[in-house]
Regions:
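N-terminal accessory/interface modules of nucleic-acid-binding and processing proteins
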Residues: 1-283
Length: 283
């Protein structure tokens, strides 16, 4: 077990180096991480990306079996995550992606929200109200404004840790002011990318690789952890708000099916079961 833990620990370190190698590598990681904003922190997101970058919904075997009534496919490979037990002693926990499971009698699919033409405007109205943003007629522009505001308000909480942990990284040669500017800009672009990606928008309309050119400076595990944690927390706040709004809309649709938009046929039952899910079925 100790050897297995060491292998996964080394995988995490190797992946930290990999994702900071270039803007493209970092953005690929952000795409995966954005799908796991709710239940998994940065360290978990990194290991999920390392082992199954195309994963969409992960849970442990007990959750799949008992709550979702899904069995894990024979021969599938679990995703190992590092946990700390009594006295801080590390151990491994294992989760499986939904693609590696199959439903049995009474089986359920995890609820994964999706932005549509029907729910887009209510989501925008909710975001304007929740975050005090006026204007921004385009959803992408609104998300860019909201994330900018969130980062401006929160990056200072994480900056002291980064200033302390910058030793041996490329940040070490910079003064505090330039580290702050670099961190704020990279954090803002990263949260924006994660949120836009999870919302299914064309990220290239709003950001390009130049916005992530400084990611290579976070080239130690400790420095990247400071950035990654801030990205995870920042995107989580906004994505939870979006998910909650869409869930409420779908619950209302389930209660009043005849009130659906004419654009969506009433007899389209593809998502009927997911409309009945409780919040805890979201991944």
């Amino acid at each position: 077990m100790a050897q297995k833990w060491q292998t996964i620990s080394e995988l995490a370190a190797d992946t930290s180096r990999k994702v900071t190698h270039s803007p493209e590598e970092w953005c690929r990681f952000l795409t995966t991480a954005a799908r796991f904003y709710k239940a998994y922190d940065f360290d978990d997101q990194l290991l999920i990306y390392a082992q199954k970058p195309d994963a969409t919904a992960c849970a442990d075997m007990s959750t799949w079996n008992n709550k979702m009534r899904r069995w894990v496919n024979a021969g599938s490979t679990a995703i190992a995550l590092i946990r700390k037990g009594y006295g801080g002693k590390p151990y491994l926990d294992y989760v499986h992606d939904v693609a590696d499971t199959h439903p049995v009698r009474g089986g359920k699919d995890p609820w994964l929200w999706k932005l549509t033409e029907e729910n887009r405007e209510p989501v925008m109205e909710r975001l304007r109200s929740a975050f005090g943003i006026d204007g921004a007629g385009d959803l992408g522009d609104l998300l860019m404004e909201v994330t900018d505001k969130l980062v401006q308000e929160s990056y200072g909480e994480y900056l002291p840790d980064l200033l302390y942990e910058r030793e041996d990284s490329f940040l070490e040669g910079l003064d505090d002011f330039n580290v702050e500017v670099l961190f704020r800009n990279t954090l803002r672009a990263s949260v924006q990318y994660a949120v836009l990606s999870r919302c299914g928008l064309d990220v290239n309309r709003y950001l390009d690789t130049e916005d992530f050119r400084e990611i290579t400076n976070f080239n130690t595990t400790a420095a990247l952890a400071c950035l990654g944690t801030a990205v995870s927390q920042g995107s989580r706040e906004l994505l939870l708000e979006i998910g909650d709004t869409i869930r409420k809309i779908e619950r209302e649709k389930a209660k009043n099916p005849l009130a659906k938009s004419d654009r969506e046929p009433y007899n389209d039952s593809r998502n009927f079961n997911t409309l009945k899910r409780e919040r805890s079925d979201e991944y």
